[in-house]
Amino acid sequence: MAPTIQTQAQREDGHRPNSHRTLPERSGVVCRVKYCNSLPDIPFDPKFITYPFDQNRFVQYKATSLEKQHKHDLLTEPDLGVTIDLINPDTYRIDPNVLLDPADEKLLEEEIQAPTSSKRSQQHAKVVPWMRKTEYISTEFNRYGISNEKPEVKIGVSVKQQFTEEEIYKDRDSQITAIEKTFEDAQKSISQHYSKPRVTPVEVMPVFPDFKMWINPCAQVIFDSDPAPKDTSGAAALEMMSQAMIRGMMDEEGNQFVAYFLPVEETLKKRKRDQEEEMDYAPDDVYDYKIAREYNWNVKNKASKGYEENYFFIFREGDGVYYNELETRVRLSKRRAKAGVQSGTNALLVVKHRDMNEKELEAQEARKAQLENHEPEEEEEEEMEAEEKEAGGSDEEHEKGSSSEKEGSEDERSGSESDREEGDRDEASDKSGSGEDESSEDEARAARDKEEIFGSDADSEDDADSDDEDRGQAHRGSDNDSDSGSDGGGQRSRSQSRSRSRSASPFPSGSEHSAQEDGSEAAASDSSEADSDSD
């Protein structure tokens, strides 16, 4: 331990009698304090103790019932600061000669672009293709930018440009002209690219609907990775994937998934044999497929929201290009295997082909009718209805004329009968006045009664002639009706054939006929499609 050295001053301080006496602390109170005892020292060190009471009970403010019941007066102006004068109209008239405040004048001034003569601003707008712009780091690029157009002026400009660029067909004639122009443009030869003048076509082929395969609905299946098995590659993998099948399945928990099946070796041999013998399938053979992968699926079709039409093209050498519709888009993603759940890796798909039933054939005919468009157009339907109405109106007028003639003949006949009755009465009165015998008078009365009840012979002949004329007119009217009906049917058949020929694609009739024949052959060949489990 190091020695302690004590100085002389320290020794003297130690021997002083008042060395241990502490001086009283000076009070901070201005007035004289009677009792000036100082507080004792803290007997122990401070400790943190949890305060058990609510700390807000001394500072929280609660309004009393007197304050709550008091209603404060809201002192406002009677007009609430809005001076309305309904009598004097000059109250709100603005004086055009009033002097504006200098601050308001600056706001109303037009922006005058100062001439930028600095070299930096002139070189600023240049775009260097190999240099990347860094707008997200600094705003230097926009600092010297000059906007020649004000935002107030550009309101509605994009809408106006859109209307000027797009041709709007407001009337029926312009629509017909535009439709006919599309047929004319399709017949023009293509000499160069629409946007690249140096690009010229090597081969020009017509584009038609695929009449052969349109009857079969097609779907686009998108895999998240290559579905080919890992142990095969090259041509063998492509051959297996070209004959693969996907089927919906359900596991033990009731979850649905899509299974991807690949053909076994025996099935590949059978398919190769069928291809060499140029047949679709052997009626008695059974084709086996083993499960390879399991997927989750996401389907979009025409009934889905946000569906976009999608088409694919088929190039046939020496024939042309044909397009078909993709009705469904299926996205497949790999399914994760769950712990404790047995996977269906040992599943086997057994396929046996059969002929198509009536329901499937009707569905194919309905799809084929989409291209042929048997239904007449609306305009032709209106023309047919107008012609039928005209034919019906002429028949009605003819019937009305015959009925009016008949009524006229009946009126003439009733008039002649009334004249005869009056003449007979006059004769009878003359005879009675002349004093003839009672026998002759009785005979005349009997004859008159007979004429009134049965009519005379002349009247019966007139009635027979008029009835014959009416029957002839009725027969002629029915003949006219049948003729008009046959004419209407001929017009209907002609309009249907005209609409059918017009709705077809713009190619010659011979090609159309051949396409339809090919479509029928495809329907005949496709009638031997696979089972519903092997679509």
Curated annotation (Swiss-Prot):
Cross-link (Glycyl lysine isopeptide (Lys-Gly) (interchain with G-Cter in SUMO2)): K133, K154
Composition bias, Basic and acidic residues: 361-374, 389-434, 442-453
InterPro entries on file: RNA_pol_II-assoc_Paf1
Residues with Phosphoserine modification: S117, S456
Cellular component annotations (GO), alphabetically ordered: Cdc73/Paf1 complex; cytoplasm; fibrillar center; membrane
Localization per Swiss-Prot or TrEMBL: Nucleus
Record region (Disordered): 1-23, 361-535
Self-association and partners: Component of the PAF1 complex, which consists of CDC73, PAF1, LEO1, CTR9, RTF1 and SKIC8. The PAF1 complex interacts with PHF5A. Interacts with POLR2A, TCEA1, SKIC3, KMT2A/MLL1, SUPT5H, RNF20 and RNF40. Interacts with UBE2E1.
Protein function: Component of the PAF1 complex (PAF1C) which has multiple functions during transcription by RNA polymerase II and is implicated in regulation of development and maintenance of embryonic stem cell pluripotency. PAF1C associates with RNA polymerase II through interaction with POLR2A CTD non-phosphorylated and 'Ser-2'- and 'Ser-5'-phosphorylated forms and is involved in transcriptional elongation, acting both independently and synergistically with TCEA1 and in cooperation with the DSIF complex and HTATSF1. PAF1C is required for transcription of Hox and Wnt target genes.
Protein name listed in UniProt: RNA polymerase II-associated factor 1 homolog
Naturally occurring in which organism (per UniProt): Rattus norvegicus (Rat)
